[in-house]
Amino acid sequence: LAAVSVDCSEYPKPACTMEYRPLCGSDNKTYGNKCNFCNAVVESNGTLTLSHFGKC
């Protein structure tokens, strides 16, 4: 099973769009889009990872 990943190298960003493309984090929390998820990844110092695309 290939690991799913998201490139968060351009983050954090000060503001995210309201675009809804959900991702499920390793914390079992649904993030509304890549920007929200990547900001959380940066805040977690890389401990948060992508579980899968779509809602948890």
From Swiss-Prot:
Which SMART domains does this chain map to?
KAZAL (SM00280)
Kindly give the SUPFAM superfamilies that the UniProt entry links to this protein.
Kazal-type serine protease inhibitors
According to the record, which residues are glycosylated?
N45
- Which cysteines pair up through disulfides? They are C8-C38, C16-C35, C24-C56
Keywords, in A-Z order: Disulfide bond, Glycoprotein, Protease inhibitor, Repeat, Secreted, Serine protease inhibitor
Gene Ontology molecular-function annotations: serine-type endopeptidase inhibitor activity
Q: Where in the cell is it found?
A: Secreted
Q: Which InterPro entries match?
A: Bifunctional_prot_inhibitor, Kazal_dom, Kazal_dom_sf, Prot_inh_Kazal-m
Name of the protein in its database record? Ovomucoid
GO CC aspect terms: extracellular space
Question: Where is each Kazal-like domain found?
Answer: 6-56
Q: Give the principal location in a single coarse category.
A: secreted
Share the domain note from the entry: Avian ovomucoid consists of three homologous, tandem Kazal family inhibitory domains.
PANTHER family the record matches: OVOMUCOID-LIKE-RELATED, SERINE PEPTIDASE INHIBITOR, KAZAL TYPE 2, TANDEM DUPLICATE 1-RELATED
Entry keyword Secreted: yes
Q: Where is this site: Reactive bond 3?
A: M18, E19
What organism is this sequence from?
Lophura nycthemera (Silver pheasant)
**UniProt entry tagged with the keyword Manganese:** no
